[in-house]
Every structure is written in structure tokens, then in C-alpha cells.
Regions:
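Catalytic cores of nucleotide-enabled group-transfer and carboxylate-activating enzymes in metabolic
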Residues: 5, 14-16, 23-77, 81-85
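Non-catalytic, glycine-rich low-complexity segments
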Residues: 1-38, 97-131
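Extended acidic/polar, glycine-enriched regions
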Residues: 57, 62-148
Length: 148
């Protein structure tokens, strides 16, 4: 079962969303949100931006110092109507990394972590199937490293 996720307190927000936020070309626009989920698995948050050119791009939002807070920034390069949305998703790699880091900090060695290392290799192997080029090779090298 995938736990429920929520996104709250999205900024910038003007008059509860009645009016668009305004800026000038070249201005750094901070965007933030509070995102949470049920359970202990890690959460990833992405900022999806649509430009006036009818193109779009995604930015991975960074965790802030406050609990459940995430930040990103964009710099508009053209006059026009820009829109954004924030998406939350389950992050199996971050969940795995957090668990393995705790086990290593507790003194467990490679032999104790054999199952965990194979789990990480499978997560990275699945990710490698979704990318090409040097990113794919980097992930496949990490898979080999975890399995050796």
C-alpha cells in the first residue's frame, strides 16, 4: 500500500490564489511548499514549471530546515504567464539510503548488509532503465559496485 501524501502552504501565493504572483525577467523566484506522507518512507517533491513558450521543465525541490518543508527557485527568462505545480512522490532510493546509512552508523558491515545492498542494486537498476547515456552508465556502475 502506498501511503497518502499531502501538499500544503504553497508559496508564492497572492490573496489565496486569486491573483498571480508577479516578478520581473531575471528575478530569482523562491518557491516553497510543505509536503508530507503517512508512514516512514521518504518523500520526493518536484516543481513542474510551464513557461510562456509552451515548454515545461522539472526541478527537484530540496528539503528545508523545517520539518516537511521543501524549497526550489526559478529565474524567469521571458515576459509572460508562467505556471507551476508541485508534485509529491514516494522516493524508494532515499528510503533505502536512509535505512542503510543508519545500519552502517550502527556498525553493521557488508556481510550484515548483503540483502540491503542487493535491494539498493535493484532500485538503481530500475532507475537505469529510465535514462540514457552517461546517467545510465553511472547507475549501472553503482549497481555493479553494490553487488561486488
Amino acid at each position: 500500500m502506498i501511503g497518502r501524501m499531502g501538499i500544503d502552504d504553497i508559496q508564492p501565493l497572492v490573496s489565496a490564489g486569486q491573483y498571480p504572483a508577479k516578478c520581473v525577467v531575471g528575478e530569482l523566484i523562491p518557491i516553497s511548499a510543505t509536503a508530507w506522507r503517512e508512514g516512514h518512507d521518504a518523500l520526493g517533491v518536484t516543481l513542474h514549471v510551464e513557461t510562456p513558450y509552451r515548454t515545461s521543465f522539472d526541478v527537484r525541490m530540496s528539503p528545508a530546515t523545517e520539518p516537511d518543508a521543501f524549497n526550489a527557485a526559478i529565474v524567469p527568462d521571458a515576459v509572460g504567464y508562467w505556471t507551476f505545480r508541485i508534485e509529491a512522490w514516494s522516493d524508494p532510493y532515499a528510503t533505502w539510503r536512509s535505512a542503510v546509512t543508519k545500519k552502517i552508523d550502527a556498525g553493521q558491515g557488508a556481510e550484515d548488509l548483503a540483502n540491503d545492498l542487493e535491494t539498493g542494486a535493484r532500485i538503481l537498476g530500475e532507475a537505469a532503465q529510465q535514462v540514457d547515456g552517461t546517467d545510465r552508465q553511472l547507475l549501472l556502475d553503482a549497481v555493479d559496485s553494490l553487488r561486488s
